[in-house]
Swiss-Prot record:
PROSITE patterns: MRG (PS51640). Pfam families: MRG (PF05712), MSL3_chromo-like (PF22732). PANTHER family: MORTALITY FACTOR 4-LIKE PROTEIN (PTHR10880), MSL COMPLEX SUBUNIT 3 (PTHR10880:SF15). It comes from Drosophila virilis (Fruit fly). InterPro entries: Chromo-like_dom_sf, MRG, MRG_C_sf, MRG_dom, MSL3_chromo-like. This is Protein male-specific lethal-3. Residues 180-202, 210-224, 234-247 have a biased composition (Basic and acidic residues). Residues 249-542 form the MRG domain.
């Protein structure tokens, strides 16, 4: 094709591609990318050409770019080899703040070879989907998993050393000896070994001080804390190189998989890989709904907590001023939580096909992702309240605790019926996972919220992660088990991203809170979420 001919479309919407670094001042490297849209255009000579809207894997959507076909390569083994060669060359010549990391660069030590998310150098630290900017004075370090050297190994083939020989069709026990225990609220508390609790601020401070002082035992603690659900298993290294020391410093994010969630994932592994079951698709509670409900739950908890704390102030003026500041803080946190869950959704969409499916389920799961099924699931999610709230909890509870009671007030206590249903759903969650076990206090606090905060909660309850115009996403098909697998992968993504350490400090508590929320919903992982593929395989979903 010459410059005087019409251009041929080379890439399609949704296709995974490799894209060259768009900034010519940076080293010439290739990033994992995805074609979001294809635009047919005409030049001055009325000749056709195509622009491709590209999203860079692991980057914020604000960095999406329109590029020509010359900047793109097909995602195949030959071009992957070129990607590794360019990355190796970039590592040799990088200077200053250039932060491109290639997972398969031969010069990296074997224990760090398979980087699953590649972050390019950007001047703006908000380039990562999970980059947030809420100021915080507390740092939380969590434990994460290691890696394998074998690129042909199943990314999710976990060690079976602690699994029962024949899995039982029910969830394992919630706690094991030596694991971190929980109080009635679902928060981690100290176990027999003296591990710090989730809410122990002094423990976080001590760990922060250790990190600043360069604790000599830090590496050993990281290795001992690694989860068996790591996507990879690191071989034991006989010596430590300078390059390996440098990469250890890049391990900024460590995510501890709690004992309860670990057992859910063991159960999921046994059901799929041992008993040859498949996940019922679409999930009863899809990932999009889980993420949305988490934001709504946290909004209610924060709002009620502010009211209870602020009411202790004696001076009315000072109390009102403090409440106003606290309400502003809650609104800011909730807005950031929306960004966090959207980042989790983006990571899931990118990593599902390559890293979040067991071999035993891959054909079935990908076979379900037909255009018709995706479209129908999207329609169901947009129009069906039962799909969003599959438990069907729609009974109203008055402040006196009577079902369908109004406590002498005509109509719902706090607003329209949808607002009331969502609020009471959140309050029941608090009751179930709280040590106080007194729903009247929570309802009293919710009832006394000022109109401004009620209006904000109403807006939050009506918020959706995906708009009705959004194209169908895989996150409306899959449920909690696949989301939990993504959380195991998440440290690799964040460690390879350009997000700053300060932003990570703010982000980690929100991720920790989300893990706590996920593991408190046992019903998302039970046997009702599985089916026999011989009976249901190849089915089409109808609206």
């Amino acid at each position: 094709m010459t410059a005087h001919e019409n251009e041929v479309q080379l890439f399609n919407r949704g296709e995974k591609v490799l894209c060259y670094e768009p900034d010519e001042s940076k080293a010439r490297v290739l990033y994992d990318s995805k074609v979001l849209a294809v635009y047919e255009r005409k030049d001055a000579a009325n000749l056709r050409y195509f622009d491709y809207k590209i999203h860079f894997q692991g980057w914020n959507s604000s960095w999406d770019r329109n590029v020509r076909a010359a900047s793109l390569l097909k995602d195949n083994e030959e071009n992957r080899k070129l990607q590794r060669e360019l990355a190796e060359a970039a590592q040799l010549q990088k200077t200053g703040g250039y932060s491109y990391k290639d997972s398969k660069t031969p010069t990296l030590p074997s224990s760090k070879k398979k980087r699953l998310a590649r972050g390019g150098h950007v001047e703006d630290p908000t380039a990562d989907p999970l980059d947030i900017s809420l100021p915080s004075s507390k740092k939380k370090r969590l434990a994460r998993g290691g890696h394998v050297e074998d690129p042909t190994a199943d990314p999710l083939d976990i060690s079976l050393a602690h699994l029962p020989a024949t899995p039982k069709p029910e969830l394992p026990a919630q706690q094991k000896r030596g694991a971190r225990s929980r109080d009635g609220s679902g928060n981690r508390s100290r176990d027999g070994s003296g591990n710090r609790s989730r809410d122990n601020s002094s423990g976080r401070k001590k760990q922060r001080d250790k990190s600043k002082g360069g604790d000599k035992n830090d590496d050993g603690e990281r290795r001992s804390a690694r989860s068996q659900f790591s996507l990879h298993v690191s071989p034991k290294d006989t010596h430590t190189t300078d390059a390996e020391k440098r990469i250890h410093q890049e391990d900024r994010v460590m995510l501890r998989i709690s004992e309860r969630l670990r057992e859910y994932m063991e159960y999921d592994y046994n059901m799929v890989c041992k008993l040859e079951k498949q996940h019922a698709l679409p999930a009863r509670t899809p990932i999009v709904t889980i993420l949305e409900n988490f934001v709504k739950q946290r909004a209610v908890e924060l709002a009620i907590g502010i009211k209870q704390d602020s009411s202790r102030a004696r001076n009315t003026l000072s109390r009102n001023a403090r409440m106003e500041r606290e309400y502003d803080r809650v609104m800011s946190i909730v807005c950031m939580l929306k960004e966090v869950v959207d980042g989790l959704r983006i990571y899931f969409e990118f990593h599902l096909e390559d890293h979040l499916l067991y071999r035993e389920e891959k054909d079935y799961a990908l076979g379900f992702l037909t255009d018709n099924n995706m479209k129908n699931c999207s329609l169901l999610l947009n129009k069906s309240y039962e799909f969003i709230n599959p438990s069907g909890d729609n009974e109203l509870i008055s402040m006196a605790g009577n079902v369908n009671g109004t406590n002498g007030v005509d109509g719902p206590l706090l607003g329209d019926i949808e607002y009331e249903n969502q609020l009471q759903k959140c309050l029941r969650y608090i009751e179930k996972n709280s040590a106080k076990n007194n729903i009247a206090l929570a309802y009293t606090a919710a009832y006394k919220l000022p109109m401004e905060m009620r209006g904000f909660l109403r807006e939050t309850f009506s918020w959706s992660l995906l708009s009705e115009e959004s194209p169908p996403e895989k996150s409306i098909i899959f449920g909690a088990p696949h989301l939990a697998r993504m959380l195991v992968l998440l440290p690799e993504c964040l460690n390879a991203s350009p997000i700053s350490n300060e932003k990570l400090v703010d982000l980690l508590p929100h991720l920790d809170s989300f893990i706590n929320y996920l593991e408190n919903h046992k019903e998302w992982f039970d046997k009702q979420n599985y089916l026999d593929p011989l009976i249901d395989q190849g089915r089409e979903l109808s609206v």
